[in-house]
From Swiss-Prot:
Protein name: Cytoplasmic tRNA 2-thiolation protein 1
Keyword Transferase on entry: yes
Biological pathway: tRNA modification; 5-methoxycarbonylmethyl-2-thiouridine-tRNA biosynthesis
GO molecular function: nucleotidyltransferase activity; tRNA binding; tRNA-uridine 2-sulfurtransferase activity
Enzyme Commission number(s) of this protein: 2.7.7.-
Primary enzyme class: transferase
PANTHER family cross-referenced by the UniProt entry: ATPASES OF THE PP SUPERFAMILY-RELATED, CYTOPLASMIC TRNA 2-THIOLATION PROTEIN 1
Lineage: superkingdom: Eukaryota
Function according to Swiss-Prot or TrEMBL: Plays a central role in 2-thiolation of mcm(5)S(2)U at tRNA wobble positions of tRNA(Lys), tRNA(Glu) and tRNA(Gln). Directly binds tRNAs and probably acts by catalyzing adenylation of tRNAs, an intermediate required for 2-thiolation. It is unclear whether it acts as a sulfurtransferase that transfers sulfur from thiocarboxylated URM1 onto the uridine of tRNAs at wobble position. Prior mcm(5) tRNA modification by the elongator complex is required for 2-thiolation. May also be involved in protein urmylation.
Gene: NCS6
Source organism of the structure: Meyerozyma guilliermondii (strain ATCC 6260 / CBS 566 / DSM 6381 / JCM 1539 / NBRC 10279 / NRRL Y-324)
Membrane-crossing residue ranges in chain numbering: none
Length: 369
């Protein structure tokens, strides 16, 4: 009679009682569901406390896209806010870029999350804000430029949405994988200036009083997916239709290849980026730079020839849209101005399709040259 094979059960490395259901990618620790929830949430809490991201009474907007990262972020922040008594008022802030078949479906998920988490929801539309949808921008500027436009417009839309809600802090679901990808992208481009921003857990737009932070800075994407799966969270999993053409996709594939050989490479890349930033800062404070006047200092010459040094006040505004900007024209307005140059051509093509060539011919006959 053939003996039955006994299947060995792997126990959790923490409680040593329950069956392990996952192995952590960062340290290969085997955990059961409950211990995984505890470790996952505690690490994020420690990140928030160490970076001093919040203070009691803060009104915080969660950048909600309906994807796994922002959905897990909303769930975890709600849990931590109640468990550790942060004293935060949490709201959901969504940006509708106007991508048919993608954003409209993901916003339906956000609206369900609003009910599940009992949080107010504000939706800011590109079309309402800029008079352009992302689909229109891509048809005009091409798919390869989509992330350039969307990144700039989205950052400003988040700031405008937060200002509308009288919020001074926005949290986003950028995770450790995203951070490592951005470090790689900036290194491949040779863009050390942007490296500091990509490694920082707390950032803000130039001239804007609104802070943006990334509580998931040290959280692996795989663990976020597992948390959403085991908690049975409602999220939208389809990738943006324009994302495959982005340069980030190249960095992502490179990161996956590196991770398969060295699982700790994600954290290693983030730490390396932070050390490069420190080295870059030290270089800027050498004697070569010390005697140069600082950009944020104004000199005022008195009648007796003495000089007063005063700091420039923040709050410069774009001459076109009136939004906070360190330049006369903000980057969003520069990009939109380039799009507007092609707007008449788009309109003529639309009229031709709808009303035929007769109207166009009649218009041309009325023109005087």
């Amino acid at each position: 009679m053939e003996e039955k094979k006994i299947r060995k059960v792997t126990l959790c490395d923490i409680c040593h009682q329950s069956k392990a259901v996952m192995k952590r990618p960062k340290n290969l620790q085997k955990l059961c569901k409950e211990c995984f929830y505890h470790v996952f949430e505690t690490e994020i809490h420690n990140t928030i406390v160490d970076a001093q991201l919040f203070k009691p009474g803060d009104k915080v907007a969660i950048g909600a896209s309906g994807g796994k990262d922002s959905t897990v972020l909303a769930s975890v922040l709600k849990t931590l806010n109640e468990k550790y008594n942060y004293g935060l008022t949490l709201v959901l802030l969504s940006i509708d870029e106007g991508i048919v078949g993608y954003r409209d479906d993901s916003l339906a998920t956000v609206k369900r999350n609003q009910i599940q988490y009992e949080m107010p929801l504000e939706i800011i539309s590109y079309k309402d804000l800029y008079n352009w949808s992302m689909d229109e921008i891509v048809s005009c500027a091409g798919i390869r430029s989509s992330c350039t436009y969307c990144g700039v417009l989205r950052r400003q839309a988040l700031d405008r949405g937060a200002a509308k809600l009288e919020i001074d802090h926005v949290v986003t679901g950028h995770n450790a994988d995203d951070m490592a990808e951005t470090v790689l992208m900036n290194l491949l481009r040779g863009d050390i200036a942007r490296l500091e921003r990509s490694c920082s857990i707390l950032t803000s737009s130039e001239g804007s009083p609104i802070k943006r932070s990334k509580p998931f800075k040290y959280t692996y994407q795989k663990e976020i997916v597992l948390y959403a799966h085991y908690k049975k969270l409602d999220y939208f999993s389809t990738e943006c239709s324009y994302a495959p053409e982005a340069f980030r996709g190249t960095a992502r594939e490179l990161l996956k290849a590196l991770e398969s050989v060295r699982p700790s490479c994600i954290m290693d890349i983030i730490y390396s980026g932070e050390h490069l930033v420190v080295a870059h800062k030290k270089k800027r404070t050498t004697e070569k730079y010390k005697n140069k006047p600082k950009k944020n200092i104004e000199t005022e010459v008195n009648s007796d020839g003495s000089v007063n040094l005063t700091k420039k006040t923040d709050g410069s505004r774009c001459e076109k849209c009136g939004y906070l900007s360190s330049n006369k024209i903000c980057k969003a307005c520069v990009l939109l101005a380039g799009l507007e140059m092609n707007r008449p051509k788009v309109n003529i093509e639309n009229n031709t399709a709808v009303e035929g060539s007769a109207k166009v011919m009649k218009t041309l006959e009325q023109l005087s040259f």
